[in-house]
Regions:
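A structural signal for multi-pass alpha-helical bundles of membrane permease subunits
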Residues: 9-224
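Single conserved hydrophobic/aromatic residue that forms the stacking wall/gate
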Residues: 1-11, 223-232
Length: 232
C-alpha cells in the first residue's frame, strides 16, 4: 500500500543517515587542526585545514607515518587486495570445475572438507602460515601477504553451486562438437560465470583490502605498511 511504501522510505532514509553521518563527521573533523579537535571535540562542519591536512597525509612522509606516505600505503593495500581477489577467483573457478565436471571419487566429501576450513579461525592458521612463508623467504613481500589467504572456500562454494545449476545437456553438446575439457571451461563456463566472477572478485577484494592481523604479523618493512595497520 501507499502508506507502507511511505513508511519504508522513512526507514531507508533513517538507515542512510545512520550510515552516512558518522562518516561525514569523521571527514569534517579531519579538516580541522588537531589542537582544535582536542579542544572542541568532533565537528560536523568543514574546517580551514582541508588542503594542508590531506596534502601532508597523502604526500609527505612526516604527515601520517615517519617513513611512508598514506598514498603509498593505499597503493600497497590495492596491490594486496587485487592479488588476493584475482588468485581467489582463479583457484575457486578451477576447484569448482574439477569438483563438478570431473568424475572425482568422493568429490562431495572433498568439497565439504574444503568448506569446513571456514570453521578454522584465522588466529589458528596464522603461525603455521607464517612459518611456511618464512621458510620460503616470502616474509615482507607482496607474495607473502597474498598467497596464504588467496584460496577461498566460500568462493569455491559459490562457483560450485553455480556450475551445478548449469544443465548437463550443455556439456554433452560440447562433447558432441569435439570440445575438450579445457575448451569447455574457457569457451563456455567462464563466459557464463562473468556475473559470478565479478561478485566474487568484489567480495574478495574488500576482504583483502581490510586485512589487518595477517599483515601486522608478516610485515616489518615500512615500505609495505598498509593503512589498516596504522589507523586500527
Amino acid at each position: 500500500t501507499l502508506e507502507s511504501r511511505g513508511l519504508g522510505d522513512v526507514y531507508k532514509r533513517q538507515g542512510l543517515l545512520i550510515m552516512v553521518v558518522p562518516i561525514w563527521i569523521i571527514f569534517a573533523s579531519s579538516t580541522h587542526s588537531s589542537l582544535f579537535i582536542n579542544t572542541n571535540g568532533l565537528q560536523f562542519f568543514l574546517g580551514d585545514n582541508f588542503i594542508d591536512n590531506y596534502s601532508r597525509v597523502l604526500f609527505k612522509q612526516s604527515g601520517f607515518f615517519n617513513e611512508i606516505t598514506a598514498l603509498k600505503m593505499f597503493f600497497n593495500s590495492f596491490v594486496m587486495a587485487t592479488g588476493i581477489a584475482t588468485l581467489s577467483v582463479i583457484t575457486s573457478l578451477m576447484a569448482a570445475y574439477g569438483l563438478v565436471y570431473f568424475k572425482v571419487k568422493y568429490a562431495t566429501f572433498i568439497f565439504w572438507l574444503i568448506f569446513i576450513t571456514l570453521l578454522v579461525p584465522l588466529e589458528l592458521r596464522i603461525m603455521p602460515s607464517y612459518i611456511v612463508m618464512s621458510k620460503l623467504n616470502l616474509v615482507n613481500t607482496f607474495a607473502g601477504l597474498i598467497l596464504p589467504i588467496s584460496a577461498s572456500a566460500i568462493a569455491t562454494f559459490f562457483f560450485r553451486q553455480f556450475y551445478k545449476s548449469i544443465p548437463d545437456e550443455l556439456l554433452e553438446a560440447a562433447k558432441l562438437d569435439g570440445t575438450n575439457s579445457l575448451r569447455f571451461f574457457i569457451d563456455f563456463l567462464i563466459p557464463l560465470s562473468k556475473t559470478m566472477i565479478a561478485a566474487v572478485f568484489i567480495f574478495m577484494f574488500v576482504f583483502g583490502y581490510n586485512q589487518y592481523l595477517w599483515p601486522l604479523i608478516t610485515v616489518s618493512y615500512t615500505h609495505l605498511t598498509l593503512p589498516t595497520m596504522q589507523v586500527v
